[in-house]
């Protein structure tokens, strides 16, 4: 019961209008240094760039020195790459809501509903299960009847290492393929 409460306390967020919502990415939030980074292809003041800042000071290309520093700290300077590396998908959870919260003499069970892009956030869910000592079952559905399934977390330490390594290798291979185009 306490483990679930600790999890809920961390992921329950109140917005500027006083409305509560849930955000699983609070368990492993994107680093502040990557928050205002935009990526793609842009030309700012005649400088072509693939990453830039957009804030109250306007648009500024990201300097190579900053990129190198972020790569050293986080393995990337691109927010989407960080999310894939740490959550297992492009976004963590979106539009998350608590469907049920049941406490019995045997324990506590909560059910959440959330959306995610391009697959379940398997790394995020596995890391949450490990961090909070929870058993998580995720039932997922791909839009337009493209598939469905069920995943259980946490994985064993051996499976966690193997799956994370396979995921990282696949991402690196995909990035290399894109760079070669």
Regions found by a protein language model. Give the residues of each.
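Intrinsic low-complexity, intrinsically disordered or marginally ordered coil/linker segments
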Residues: 1-181
């Amino acid at each position: 019961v306490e483990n679930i409460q600790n999890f809920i306390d961390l992921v329950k967020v109140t917005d500027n209008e006083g409305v509560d919502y849930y955000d699983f990415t609070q368990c492993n939030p994107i680093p502040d240094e990557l928050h205002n980074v935009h990526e793609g292809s842009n030309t700012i003041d005649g400088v072509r760039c693939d990453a830039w800042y957009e804030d109250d000071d306007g648009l500024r290309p990201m300097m190579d020195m900053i990129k190198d520093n972020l790569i050293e700290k986080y393995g990337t300077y691109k927010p989407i790459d960080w999310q894939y590396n740490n959550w297992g998908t492009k976004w963590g959870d979106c539009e998350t809501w608590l469907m049920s919260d049941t406490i019995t003499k045997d324990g506590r069970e909560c059910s959440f509903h959330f959306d995610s892009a391009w697959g379940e956030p398997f790394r995020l869910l596995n890391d949450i299960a490990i961090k909070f000592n929870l058993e998580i079952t995720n039932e997922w559905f791909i839009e337009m009847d493209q598939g469905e399934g069920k995943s259980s977390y946490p994985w064993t330490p051996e499976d966690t290492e193997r799956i994370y390594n396979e995921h990282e290798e696949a991402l690196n291979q995909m990035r290399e393929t894109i760079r070669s185009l």
